[in-house]
From Swiss-Prot:
Pfam families: Fimbrial_K88. The lineage of its organism: Bacteria, Pseudomonadati, Pseudomonadota, Gammaproteobacteria, Enterobacterales. Belongs to the fimbrial K88 protein family. Keywords: Fimbrium, Plasmid, Signal. K88 minor fimbrial subunit, plays an essential role in the biogenesis of the K88 fimbriae. Fimbriae (also called pili), are polar filaments radiating from the surface of the bacterium to a length of 0.5-1.5 micrometers and numbering 100-300 per cell. They enable bacteria to colonize the epithelium of specific host organs. This is K88 minor fimbrial subunit FaeH. GO terms for cellular component: pilus. It comes from the Bacteria. InterPro entries: Fimbrial_K88_FaeH. Residues 1-24 form the signal peptide. It is found in: Fimbrium.
Amino acid sequence: MKITHHYKSLLSAIISVALFYSAAPHADILDGGEIQFNGFVTDDAPKWTWQISSPDQTWAVDTADARTENGQLVFDLSDKGPLPFLEGYLYEVAERGGPGFTPFITFSSNGRPFAVKEGSDTSVQRFRASVPVRDPETGNVSGQLSFTLNQGMAVSTGKQEEGASTPSGMSLVSGQSVTDVQSGSLPQGLKNRLSALLLMNKGFGNGMSAVDNGQVITQGVLADGRVMNLAAAYASAVSDFELRLPAEGTPARWQAGLNVTVTVQ
């Protein structure tokens, strides 16, 4: 996993998988699947730090484990996840809310938006999507990779002056970054990660707590200048992978790209 800084808020991950046929006659093993994550991130006025948190992966698939459907081999790769994806947190606890704390997150593959299969769009807390799988030798689309993405943003605040009232503990936020937020349906692993990321905000303390309070509040708290001692974090993970490749002429290698762009306002 590699992170490179540039002038715009851009972070990308490329999943590159090589599939090799065994030399044995009638062999069904596609061996040596390698997943590589590469990240690129920048921020004009950085208040957040961003990272793609999964190391490179190596997968192997066996056609004996696939089912055939409409001329395709369908591989259930749900045992390969969840994998942490985009994560972020404030460099330091903000004295007050205001501009520069609200990230807008968009996902794409090869310049095109994810094909959303479940959920209204890619801003919701949980959605299922697919991206094209290409043969790197020809550049042609040879299949698709489907997955579920869960995401959440959380805040915790410390002591407040009169005029501002915020819950104690870690609250999920709903708004421009993540919509359709329901605390009870966010995976516990992501909640635990959000708590850990909040603690990475430099200066976390002064009455703050990273313990989940089960509440959902408006993301407007990040832009509210009345709110003091503000910590924030974002986390996402991909899981429930399904790979579809042609049953005839299965490519020796395939590649799929997952890109995420972060614009902070």
